[in-house]
């Protein structure tokens, strides 16, 4: 039995703008999603083929996609609108054999204070045989310039035989410092394709590391 939250998710104008920037959404999407805002779950929806479960041992969620799932997507944006909010979140993705799905992630920070706001996201992917994932991740920051916006994304991929993952990562603007780490192991005939776009507006430090 899947979970469906038929609710009016309450977001202020700042959060709505962040959601549009990082997920391209003007409203709550159809299908599976998990929206996190200032350290708490703002809204969640699952489908018959995509389940989302809150972790019990640390901060984060498990996204479980059934074998053979095609033409479905899941959105998991993170919004920080309180100055000084800092978090480390662990999201694990389990993609069943033969599935072909799109995953849209990303984080938006609004910081109009003097404190540092930071989001460290650790995303681990487990792709079964012949599974395919298009993974889109966007980072965006804004504020009055007095407090720093920091994001440190880490992506770990485990691809079984014939699996394919395409990563599209975009740092839009407004991030002061970021370290991106990508690690993975690929079985026979598996492939990983990475596209990274970085805007250097306000960026003071950027580093990308890959270990494949």
Regions found by a protein language model. Give the residues of each.
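Extracellular beta-strand scaffolds
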Residues: 100-101, 110, 131-133, 163-165, ...
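Acidic/polar low-complexity surface segments
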Residues: 110-114, 142-147
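N-terminal leader/transition segments
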Residues: 1-100, 104-114
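Surface-exposed loop/turn motifs in large extracellular/passenger domains
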Residues: 117-129, 150-154
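Single conserved hydrophobic/aromatic residue that forms the stacking wall/gate
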Residues: 202-212
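Loop-centered beta-sheet repeat module
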Residues: 148-204
């Amino acid at each position: 039995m899947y979970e469906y939250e038929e609710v009016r998710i309450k977001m202020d104008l700042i959060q709505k703008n962040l959601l549009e920037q990082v997920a391209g959404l003007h409203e709550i999407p159809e299908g599976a999603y998990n929206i996190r805002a200032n350290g708490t779950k703002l809204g969640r929806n699952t489908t018959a083929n995509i389940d989302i479960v809150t972790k019990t041992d640390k901060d984060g969620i498990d996204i479980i996609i059934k074998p053979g799932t095609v033409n479905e997507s899941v959105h998991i944006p993170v919004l920080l609108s309180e100055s000084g909010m800092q978090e480390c979140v662990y999201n694990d993705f389990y993609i069943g054999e033969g599935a072909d799905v799109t995953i849209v992630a990303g984080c938006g920070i609004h910081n109009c204070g003097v404190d540092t706001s930071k989001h460290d996201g650790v995303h681990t992917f487990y792709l079964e045989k012949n599974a395919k994932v298009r993974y889109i991740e966007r980072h965006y920051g804004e504020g009055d310039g007095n407090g720093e916006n920091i994001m440190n994304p880490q992506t770990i991929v485990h691809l079984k035989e014939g699996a394919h993952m395409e990563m599209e990562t975009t740092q839009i603007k407004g991030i002061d410092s970021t370290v991106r780490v990508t690690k993975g192991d690929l079985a026979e005939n598996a492939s990983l394709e990475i596209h990274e776009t970085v805007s250097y507006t306000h960026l003071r430090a950027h580093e990308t590391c890959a270990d494949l």
